[in-house]
């Protein structure tokens, strides 16, 4: 049974969350490079520029579990099924991402288009997001997400089996504060349509999180309506925080 999103608290916009830090956020920060991540499960090979044998060795491998890093469910364990293509976002990448976004996501509206273990969306819900939609195609993972949300009493989280890109396209303009885009690395045809659909649904000061096997540049992103805000590399994983191309040209206002 799909769980419905809870009643939203007074919304705190992404811009407001950043302003509480008392610091200006640069339009584009310098890329951060982290040492290679501990092995986890790979969803696929990195682009053809990297030999397949090298890619298979470099990408995260393995099942086991990951943990929610912050918020009300801090240290909660999330099972990682031994399923071909399942590649949860490494803990330290999620930690950096939510340091960028801020620890308090009170009122945010989120969509995790390729949910998998649900780590990204549940991390947002743990930090106060008002509505989180987890979209996943695999029936087994959907059942696992339903059970997990029931155990956590995660009333703000809805789990839906389906196509993440189609779900993004159904979102009204301005209805999302963040979209998490983390498709299987080998399915390169998914990236551009997902990013374009996310941009169309994004609130003016919202964000898109993109995880990929290689870095995306503004030359690739701007035609899709987005621009790079932050980037880091952790082993074979490239994490990008994106904003709407028009919004990225404007620095975040000071408090």
Which residue stretches match the model-derived regions?
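Class I S-adenosyl-L-methionine-dependent methyltransferase catalytic core
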Residues: 1-255
